[in-house]
Amino acid sequence: MAKVSSAYLKFALVMILLLSVISAVMSAGCIKNGGRCNASAGPPYCCSSYCFQIAGQSYGVCKNR
């Protein structure tokens, strides 16, 4: 088995922690089902990843598909 430098291991650990924090922040900022959303706008997004919006309306509703 090849030796891995401690600097590489530290870097990998920091990257994993950073990605975990980013993922937690992004999921915490989502809109729950029943909340208002805009399918064509940016964050926050629906937790279900689906915004039901009828054409011509300014907002939609987060729901499961």
From Swiss-Prot:
Q: Where in the cell is it found?
A: Secreted
Q: Which organism is it from?
A: Phytolacca americana
The residue range of the signal peptide is 1-27
- Would you tell me the protein name for this molecule? Antimicrobial peptide 1
**Entry-linked InterPro entries:** Antimicrobial_C6_CS, Gurmarin/antifun_pep, Gurmarin/antimicrobial_peptd
Cellular component aspect of the GO annotation? extracellular region
Q: In which tissues is it expressed?
A: Seed specific.
User: Which Pfam families does its entry note?
Assistant: Antifungal_pept (PF11410)
The keyword Endoplasmic reticulum appears for this protein: no
Alphabetical keyword list: Antimicrobial, Disulfide bond, Fungicide, Knottin, Plant defense, Secreted, Signal
Predominant subcellular localization, coarse grouping: secreted
Family in the record: Belongs to the AMP family.
